[in-house]
């Protein structure tokens, strides 16, 4: 009877020696497989792409595009992408505009910074303000010059922004179109990438427009809103008003006719004259000591000679309460300790100012 082991080990046996066990010969066969070597070499070349020079990369790209297996490779990549990449069909076609950006655009258009150049910013001025004298004309001219400067800077920066955005977008689109020759990139994906780039750049546009709006608001506050505030009177106007006040100290309430005459001589409005006298009476009460010195100064001027600004008040020789030490009860008919300023013509104390020599309009 034949030995079973000898039968299995013979060349005519059913199973070869070392069946199912790894051998060095088998490993060597795998290593010597040309296809495995090609794949490994390709992977190594892919890893070394970042180290290549531009000329080397262009040469290899040309070689790949001319390779006879290039269409097959592209078809395989398309098949893989169909299975793995999310579909863009359900993505939103276009996002709604940013409401904050729309508000900034509307403000810039209203102020004449954006859109066609116009007088913008000064349109809300009333005709009375525009004809309010040489000072107003100079102020409005200065405002328009500053606004034109802001407009120029804004358009220069906006042009730089649009140029940078356009250049970067064009560069990315060209890059994606070039890559689409090797890997599948649809026009829809390129359009989506352009939208992403524009959203990134919109933050720069937002900052530019916000800074411009802030500059316009500061300019409005400085030049246009200033006309509602107090302005320095000329030295001549201060002399006229002070002389009338101290020469009528017994009753420093000019009539409407006197106010009109004072306004004409000083080149100011009747309302400014009224406010000046109200503030002057308050300052006189609060600074009675300093007012005494100022009154003596104007009395000396009147004694030296009649002033061309005189409104025909009491005679220069008439004694006034300011010519002697101030009594407990002042010459205007009210107690210094009382809260009222005048029983006949009350004045809103909220408009008063504490500084003595600051002759300003409201």
Swiss-Prot record:
Lineage of the species this protein comes from: Eukaryota, Metazoa, Ecdysozoa, Arthropoda, Hexapoda
Function: Transcription factor which acts with the selector homeodomain proteins altering the regulation of downstream target genes such as wingless (wg), teashirt (tsh) and decapentaplegic (dpp), thus affecting segmental identity.
The protein's name in its UniProt record: Homeobox protein extradenticle
Subcellular localization(s) per the UniProt record: Nucleus
Gene3D superfamilies: Homeodomain-like (1.10.10.60)
Family of this protein: Belongs to the TALE/PBX homeobox family.
Region (PBC-A) location: 41-120
Gene Ontology MF terms in the entry: cis-regulatory region sequence-specific DNA binding; DNA binding; DNA-binding transcription factor activity; DNA-binding transcription factor activity, RNA polymerase II-specific
InterPro entries, per the entry: HD, Homeobox_CS, Homeodomain-like_sf, KN_HD, PBX_PBC_dom, TALE_homeobox
